[in-house]
Design a protein with these regions (language model features):
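Glycine-rich loop(s) and the adjacent beta-strand/alpha-helix scaffold that form part
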Residues: 101, 108-198
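Conserved redox-cofactor binding core of oxidoreductases
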Residues: 1-108, 177-201
Length: 203
């Protein structure tokens, strides 16, 4: 959480879960369909509203924030990589896959990676940040010997730390977005035509 707070520049929220001094911009949606407001209003009649899905509570009805700046996508690359890619103390390795992290007394000391079938080992001077995402990070930890001992042993991986939560508690939700161009802000585009169509349906 401290790294998330440090990275974030939230235009609206500033509390223990959010920061306003980082490069990754988080904003409210600039435009929303009127039906969105109708949906939230209807949902709030039967369930609690939530103005911050990245705060202490992730349940409720509301409109979520987006990683945008001035209406454009603000990704980690936009926030961090693009401004720093010309720095002399930064090396960007493409076509590279991290295999595992090497530990000494449970302190991360180096990273084994593969670049175009060539194995490299990169040594840390200060610290190693693992940013492989919901799938990549636990997988790298498991290959490095951190995870459920019985699972690691079944794959002939030496267990350095028996940590049963690694790779076993993925919780996700489906977010399916589809876009269509219509000539009306109404949900059914042309309400009267839709009503005429519905009148032809017999149950």
């Amino acid at each position: 959480l401290p790294y998330f707070v440090k990275s974030e520049h939230n235009e609206a929220l500033d509390d223990q879960y959010h920061g306003q001094n980082g490069p990754l911009n988080v904003a409210q949606l600039r435009h929303d369909n009127p039906f969105t407001r109708y949906f939230v209003e209807a949902g709030s009649k039967h369930y609690k509203t939530n103005d911050d899905f990245n705060g202490s509570d992730q349940e409720g009805v509301g409109v979520y924030q987006v990683t945008q700046k001035n209406g454009k996508r603000c990704s980690a690359a936009v926030a961090y990589l693009n401004p720093a890619k010309h720095r002399k103390n930064l090396t960007i390795m493409t076509d590279t896959v991290v295999d595992k992290i090497n530990f000494k007394n449970l302190t991360a000391v180096s990273v084994k990676c593969i670049t175009k079938n060539k194995v490299n080992e990169l040594y840390a001077k200060k610290e190693i940040l693992l940013c492989g995402g919901a799938y990549g990070s636990p997988t790298i930890l498991q290959r490095s010997g951190i995870g459920n001992e019985s699972f690691l042993q079944s794959h002939n991986i030496e267990c350095l730390l028996d940590l049963k939560g690694v790779g076993e508690n993925l919780q996700d939700h489906i977010d399916y977005i589809t876009s269509h161009r219509v000539d009306s802000w109404e949900l059914f585009a042309k309400p009267f035509k839709s009503l005429k169509f519905l009148s032809l349906i017999h149950i």
